[in-house]
Structure formats: structure tokens, C-alpha cells
């Protein structure tokens, strides 16, 4: 981390208050991977959030650096370690964090908990989340099918965005992928599923990463393929209460012959 002590101390003087429990630097500066345009991310752990919601996350320019200030309830961050959807982000973030203020040892204890984190305890909840996402996104499939049938570009693109975004998260959470950086999110998921897999090829087309996927029809069709392959990936996790919705949705995709 190349930030100078005077800079850090100056920042802490502006940040500190009676509600602050501790402060950590996260992101590229914590990992030693900062570049020319990197901002400095301060996670500020507090006992009470600022009253104005806009003050809970804000940006500033200090000493010619873009500063990100994110206020988080300390107890809420600890609770994130028990939620699979949040843990894939919280655990690596806490492990990498460089603590610059720890008033009572709470920050050290939180980082220790992150280093001792056991994903296996959350796997059942992660499986349930993935199954719920497959079921819940049947609505987006219907929207894509409707948009394609009506040749309505905006409908297809909006539903494609939501469907693919949610299938990505389902895979990341179910597989317990530790997101070491938001810049690696798409890389980590594609690497996990397989760069040459049908799922990844469909994702890249749906997301517009394929040079031949500029047309909304191709992207919508690829998003439907992502859904089918994700449903197949998690087939054994889908409970009976969701089976009819998922199976009917898969049949609609098949019948559409897109």
C-alpha cells in the first residue's frame, strides 16, 4: 500500500467520530494493485449510520485523490459472514482489508472471523438461493419470449439484463466464489463454469461480448440459453414446490424454437 502515513492520518481526522468503531482501507490500495485512476476505498465501521442516507456512501477529492467513503454498521458486517449472498463479497474484502483504525480490538476480531470463515456451513443456504433464483427468474424468461414475439427491442434487452445478471449471481453464490475484486467478478464466474463451456458462450453472447451479438434478438435468445443451462446445472437443488414453474418455463423456451 503506497499511501503515506500523513495522508492516512489526515483522512482519519476527517472521518473519526464517537460512532466510529474502526476504519479499513479496501480495494486496489489494500491489495497493492492500485493504478493511475484508482480511488482510495475507506470502509468505516460504525455503531450508528449517518442520518442522511447520502452520507452513508459518498465520494470526495482529498489531496488530489478520489476517496470513497462507505459507512457500515459493524454488527451488520459481522452478520454478512452468515449470509451466502453477502459472504462471497464480505469475506475476501475483510481478509484483504488494511486496518488503519481499531479503537477496541473489534476490527481485529472481525478480520479473524473472516480468515476462519467456513463456506461449508453456508452451502445449504447457497443451494436454496440458487434454486430460488432459477424459479424467480421465470418471469424474465416470459418477458424475453414476449419481447421477441412482438419484436420489441427494449423489452428483450431489459429482461435479458436482469435474467443474465441474476443467473450470474446464482452461480457465484451457489459455488461459493470468493469475489476478491469486483473487477474480477465476470472472470471468476467464467473460469469456474469453464471458459469453453456452452454456458459461458451463451453468457458472452447475451451480454454483448460476442462481436456477432449486436442484435437484440441474438442476445435475448442467448439469455434464454443461459437460463436453460443454469436450470440444468442446479436441477437437483430445485425443490418440488418450484418444479412446476421451472419445468413449464423450460418447455415454453423449447416450444418457442428460438
Where are these regions (language model features)?
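Serine/threonine-rich low-complexity intrinsically disordered regions
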Residues: 4-5, 14-17, 49-52, 63, ...
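Metal-dependent nucleotidyltransferase catalytic core
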Residues: 1-38, 43-94
